[in-house]
C-alpha cells in the first residue's frame, strides 16, 4: 500500500535568511519512493510503510537543516535536524533513522509535529495537517 506526504513550506521571518531546498533523499525500505513538486508543494510518494524522505535546506546566510518525514508501522513521523555541517548531507542523515542509528528513536516516536530552535535562533516546525490515512499532509514552517 503506497503512502504520500505532501509538504507546504512557509518562511515567516526573512530576517533569519531565505531557505532553499538543496537536496532530497528517499530511504530504500518499502520499495523506496520519489519526490515530486507541484504548485509549490513537495510530495514524497513511498512504496509502503517503513520508509522516509529527507529534504535538506540551506539559508542565504549559510544555515543548514534537514526535515525528515516518513511512515513507520503505518503511522506518520517527522523530525528536524539543525546545526548541520556541510558534509552532513541528507544522504548521510536519512539512514541514521534506521538499523539502531542515532536518530532511530525519533522515527519510533511517530510524532505528528515537532519544533526546534537552532543555535542561531531560527525556529523550525513540522506539523501534520492530515495525520491519518495514506495521503498525509504537513506544513514546514521557518520563523
UniProtKB/Swiss-Prot annotation:
For this protein, the record's InterPro entries field holds: Cytolysin/lectin, Fruit_body_lectin_fun
Q: Which UniProt keywords apply?
A: Lectin
Q: Where are the coiled-coil regions?
A: none
Its annotated function is as follows: Lectin that recognizes O-linked galactose-beta-1,3-N-acetylgalactosamine, a disaccharide (Thomsen-Friedenreich antigen or T-disaccharide), present on cell surface glycoproteins. Can also bind chitin, N,N'-diacetylchitobiose, N-acetylgalactosamine and N-acetylglucosamine. Inhibits proliferation of colon, breast and liver cancer cell lines (in vitro).
User: What is its quaternary makeup?
Assistant: Homotetramer.
The entry sums up its family as follows: Belongs to the fungal fruit body lectin family.
Name used for this protein in its record: Boletus edulis lectin
Q: Which organism is it from?
A: Boletus edulis
